[in-house]
């Protein structure tokens, strides 16, 4: 839902004080007339730059003159242009270049001066002179996209500006410059749908009353204009408040103001050029820029808003916006529900609602004063990435007619608007105003701050940072309220030439910072703005101009601002809020980080890092001392502030902070009248009690600041004695009571804070002790567990080592026993033969294993054979390998135990470091607690000093009171009033305080009751004495009456003397009673304070004892840890010993392994010798026992071997049969699939051929009909000609033509019938040929299989064992190859086979496979037929290659190797049979072959040579397809050549060949 914003000008009602003036600015009438008539000047709307603010029409609907009027840069300052330069600088441009062409990538770009206006127009010209006509203009409001073009152009820092009609490429000199330009230009396409507002407030459209002014004032008022629409806009609560605001301001320093004359101004006059922030360009000026002094203005009328003549940018390029005489106050509906803004709203609205009334009264009082303040601001730019704004405040002396004028000029908060809340944050710091008097003031504090410098930027700077607008002193103060308070130019009423200056002392800073996301830890760049107590961050400065806020942070909620060296970015710092939320920021340099830290800490009220904590308090005390006015009565000096700890801010209440920040900290009151003083104190107490104690700590500082602003220094009013002393006494009593209540409230607050701090300290101490105890117990448990685990592992390792030692000893003993056994056997068998000894020596092996080998003694060496020896050898070898594996496993376990020991050592070191860290932290916390206790004692001593000072003041007031009692009537009045008050006190209830709910108020109430009772006793005694004095007076009067006749003069004198004496006595008695009551009260208080001191000392002793206990616990834990460390050291030593033992054992194992290896080598040598000796023994045995050998044994042995071989052969044959069956089944399935595929292809080809023939017949019929029609038409023409020639020739010609036509018709009909018959015959022949080929191939395959079966049977029937062995070997090798191929199939092989077959039919076709040339190539290219004709003359090996692919595992499984050459030939024959002619078949018909087929079939039909139609048809065919004859001749001529055409060409030219043969036969017959 979008609403159109209509900016109207409504003149305000004239004020009652002045009549309405007829003179107004001329722009109001111009705007109303411009809407009805044609708009003569296009002025862009502030919300939608493409619309005019006068007529609300689009830019395109305006005339060229109106647009040119907007574009011009006026040199006359009285008529400024409506648009401004947002950014300018030198860039490089590539005009209309196509970067897809590599030539443009190497060209040089053109350097041009770019100017971006605020209405979205981007122009570039050759130089930076304003008179130069721009070369091109880009409307950024129509731009679709602004992106980086580095990949497209190949140039770094390039940008692509994509518009609907063209793409413009630009680039900067550096990456920063191009990024700045990209950020600014990319905001235009992104903000197309962002200009619509949802609401306007017509109530804010108020203009103050006008008065006749000079031309200079009018030009000044039109020149000063609000140049930006800020995100935060505050509105006045009513029209009257706005009128009061505007009426209290004056515009120019040269304008004069008379008493009672109304002030002439408009709202647009408040938005001066010098208030502009100048950040809309998105860049800052470099530090090394030269500053230039401002030249005097052209005239006095434009002194405030004029521009520098020497500044070429400011004088020629910059054009001020045409300001409307009246503008409406608007509020943008903020629809962003961000958490930060909501939190700030929640924390601030409580304060704002409570103090709304007070602030509004202060504002009314401030606005009703007739003071005039001047304002002059300049700016200073510090660095490229940030901008610091230091607020310079100069104090001026003005007359003060009302005490409320000293209060800060603030405005009431709007409770329902977020911008009002944000402005409340900004306005939280009050300004300090000095009071002037006719007399010379005392020493005042002059605030010396840095004077901002005015920089000027040359236009030719290629970085583009123009900074054409001056910077605003307070950027957030964009509304008229704040400008009227802080930045209004006026002239002093005294007529001095130099106006006084006042500025807001707000913290302000801007710059680029990197912000880290808490979830993803990614860094993003934002434009940060610190204004007052709010830290805003935007995407870029342009978003700040438009008010598009990314987030806001309340600086008052910060508890720490510290550097962050552990961050991934350099120059990082961390902000922590009261709810433990962290915000990590990073700057681009250390200097900027330090400046940000300083400004943020000062804005948050935190102490600086590099300065001592006392400095801020001392400076504040010094400032307050300087601001105090000279008093008529002596004031006690303020006590110096104690050491400033971080806990002070945390535990300080709002009331304490307010009193400390106010001027009377240390002194109870400034010397002001008692009535005003008591009222102010009561009001401050009420405001303190109204604050909620449950508010979060985020509002702590705001409350402190508000209290501080409430308690500003009061005016000095000289004390005037009242005519009656009774009122004075009453007022003094009230003041004393108020002071006593204040002292009691303060003491109660101090006690409450002390109790809270003590409770928190004790709770923290207990928590830390519990935490330390738990951590120590955990550490002990973990250490004990680790020690237990280590001990278990060590015991296990020791047991394993012992087992290994036992097994080694057992193995060594076994080896020694075996050696002895071998020696004994050798000694026993030494007498035997040499052969037997060698046999025994080599048959018995050496047992060298680590396992149990006791069974070696049971071995009979005579019964050992070769197999048993091999088995024994394998068994021994396996045992030895097991022993080696066990040794390796032990080594691995040893390594694992070493690694575990290292990990335990590391864990122990980490625990020790953690313990030391904990000890350090505990020591630091103990020091902090001691420091806090010391701070509390200092505060207690300062409170005692204040109590003493208050006692002195009470004594002085008592003296004054005793001296002021004069007269009897006054004393009676005073006593009656005191009596009445006591009666009221008795009857009424004591007032409840805000802290009555707490238990700490019960002793105070009891003390107050005691004090009231004592006062009642005193009053009763004084009343009795007064009654006695009255009775004495009555008696004296009666005596006087009786004695009047005797001596009237003496009696009167005596009566007067007695009265005087009585009065003096009564006064002395009353004063003594009052002194006694005061002394009693002070004594009671002293007793209470002593009791509290004793309690505090007891608490201190208790804390000291707790500290001693904690120290003892720490010492005990240290001793425990030392013992644990000693145990660890002893265990380390034991572990080292164990490691040494393990090393020794590993060395012994290595030696034993070497020994085993040597023994193995020796065993191998012995085995070789044993084998040789066995061979020799066999030869000797054969030679000796050749004659006695038994033939039956040989036969049995050979029969067993033959049986084994036969079983093997049977197994191989069964495997072959199964494989053969599997192969045949696979082949049959493949054959069936191929037959089905070929049948389907055949059917499709036949259907296509029939469709082609039908289409050809239809085409021939249509061609014949057309030809007949042409012939008939031609015949008619010739017939008409012949008729014209004569009737004689007509008869003969007609007969001849009729005969020709009849013959032609008959021939056409006959040939069409013949052609259709031949086509049908050809189709039938083709089908028969396919069936014959398939049958032939199947028959050949079956024949080959039968031959294979015969071969297998022959192999099976053969009785030759050698052939069987060879056959089985080949079978097993083939089986292995078959298995390998079945497991992994290799790449397919291309087999080429040449086979030439001829058939008995006339249409002889070769059954070879297809050539590599595709049919589309031969038909699309007319030269392809010639290439095929040339390829037909090539050798037959290249022509007849087959592309049929068979996997190698199928070939290997289907072929059985044979020993003779016949198997090889049969195998090749099987390859040829498998490679059938139809395997590579493809249908010959294609949809795009129709024309060629028609031409081939029509051009070679057997037509009579005498027919004209045949001749013309041949000519047309020869002209249309000259290559067709070559195709047919090349395909038909070599009939006996084995290189025959493929099936593609066969089906294509079958009908043509048949017709050709018929034509040849007819020619031969003729």
From Swiss-Prot:
Residue spans of biased composition, Basic and acidic residues class: 646-663, 976-989, 1423-1438
InterPro entries, A to Z: Actin_Cytoskeleton_Reg, M-RIP_PH, PH-like_dom_sf, PH_domain
Positions with biased composition (Low complexity): 1-16, 23-32, 392-405, 990-1003, 1393-1414, 1520-1536
SMART domains: PH (SM00233)
Key words, A-Z: Repeat
Alphabetized SUPFAM superfamilies for the sequence: PH domain-like
Molecular function terms from GO: actin filament binding
Ranges for region Disordered: 1-32, 194-318, 373-415, 483-509, 627-728, 976-1004, 1375-1438, 1514-1544
GO CC terms of this entry: actin cytoskeleton
Feature: compositional bias, Acidic residues: 271-293
Pfam families: PH (PF00169)
PH domain residues: 84-190, 506-605
Feature: compositional bias, Polar residues: 211-224, 236-269, 373-382, 487-496, 627-636
Cross-referenced CDD domains: PH_M-RIP, PH_RIP
Lineage top rank: taxon: Eukaryota
Name listed for the protein in its UniProt record: Protein outspread
Taxonomic source organism: Drosophila melanogaster (Fruit fly)
Gene it is expressed from: osp
